[in-house]
Amino acid sequence: MLVSDFHFDLPDELIARYPTEERTASRLLHLNGETGHFEDKQFFDLLDQINEGDLLIFNNTRVIPARLYGRKASGGKLEVLVERVLDEHRCLAHVRASKAPKEGAELVLGEDKLGEGNGFKAIMTARHDALFELHFNEEQPVFDLLQQAGHMPLPPYIDRPDEDADQERYQTVYSKVLGAVAAPTAGLHFDNPTLEKLKAKGVNIAFVTLHVGAGTFQPVRVDNILDHKMHAEYAEVSQAVVDQILATKATGKRVIAVGTTSVRSIESAAQAAEKEGKLIAPFFSDTSIFLYPGKTFRVVDALVTNFHLPESTLIMLVSAFAGYRNTMKAYQHAVEAKYRFFSYGDAMFINKNPNALNDLP
């Protein structure tokens, strides 16, 4: 199975660089995975697709202002993108500079926001492949420093500096647990009134946590997808969520994941539980689960997701869920119908294709 099987041509003007004025004002493409039929709708029509007793699972991670601008103490500009906070004073980060800092190098960060001479210092203590371990010398915890001097880490394809409005719009309204460097973007379409309408309809709601890493934007750099090594991200699925999933399945209702990160959290927990002969069990660990055509989904019955990059692991996940041909036809239609793509773009609602295992490239 080749990465090129998941290519499609996307005109640049279809990449959404700003969100819609209202969260729910996006369009929605409804794809029935079983029949392959798709239909153009508006996002607020999603309320008609979700039934009483269904369980809607969201990812409650909160994006940290993870991008810092600065310089080496010896001179030379650099950009830091925090990937993971290790403790109150250490983090792993990507560092972009004309020359990579060496072990022991001192970095001065945040002067663009705090003023010249008011930046804070970090020492590069170790390198772990593409990531640099940074130790912050300040008394304040890393999260506090990022809140003061960090920028929202907008994806590279948005191709503009972050603005004040992004601090709100690049977060879901239910985000709670600090740790992501990218938003779980399917959730950006939900506002509080929509959540209240779902609850009033008798739809159950649960939250998992997966801290989305910068690796989600990395291109697949191999020809055969079986050679791809998936990046790891930390995920949590609590006992309470497991109980809700089991209760939903027992009544014949659907488990609906909001976003691919929710899917990966739930299916990681299910995959780990399979060894114990269970459908799903609590999960608190890193996951590098890679779902592509030929892989099965043990728990998730339907999916809300945005439109993803060509040749990305996320369009591979959607193809595994809805069927390869169904997915590529729906994407072709989305391009022709001028849907808006990627993080600030439009959404899909997909019912699982029970025959997806037979629909391979």
UniProtKB/Swiss-Prot annotation:
Q: What class of enzyme is it?
A: transferase
According to the UniProt record, one GO cellular component term is:
cytoplasm
| Listed GO MF terms | S-adenosylmethionine:tRNA ribosyltransferase-isomerase activity
User: What are the entry keywords?
Assistant: Cytoplasm, Queuosine biosynthesis, S-adenosyl-L-methionine, Transferase
Annotated EC: 2.4.99.17
| UniProt-annotated location(s) | Cytoplasm
Q: Name one GO biological process term.
A: queuosine biosynthetic process
Pathway-wise, it operates in: tRNA modification; tRNA-queuosine biosynthesis
Catalysed conversion reaction: 7-aminomethyl-7-carbaguanosine(34) in tRNA + S-adenosyl-L-methionine = epoxyqueuosine(34) in tRNA + adenine + L-methionine + 2 H(+)
Entries under SUPFAM superfamilies matching the protein = QueA-like
- Report the transmembrane regions from the record: none
Q: What InterPro entries would the database entry show?
A: QueA, QueA_dom1, QueA_dom2, QueA_sf
Give the multimer and partner information.
Monomer.
* Protein's job: Transfers and isomerizes the ribose moiety from AdoMet to the 7-aminomethyl group of 7-deazaguanine (preQ1-tRNA) to give epoxyqueuosine (oQ-tRNA).
Q: Which family does it belong to?
A: Belongs to the QueA family.
This protein's name: S-adenosylmethionine:tRNA ribosyltransferase-isomerase
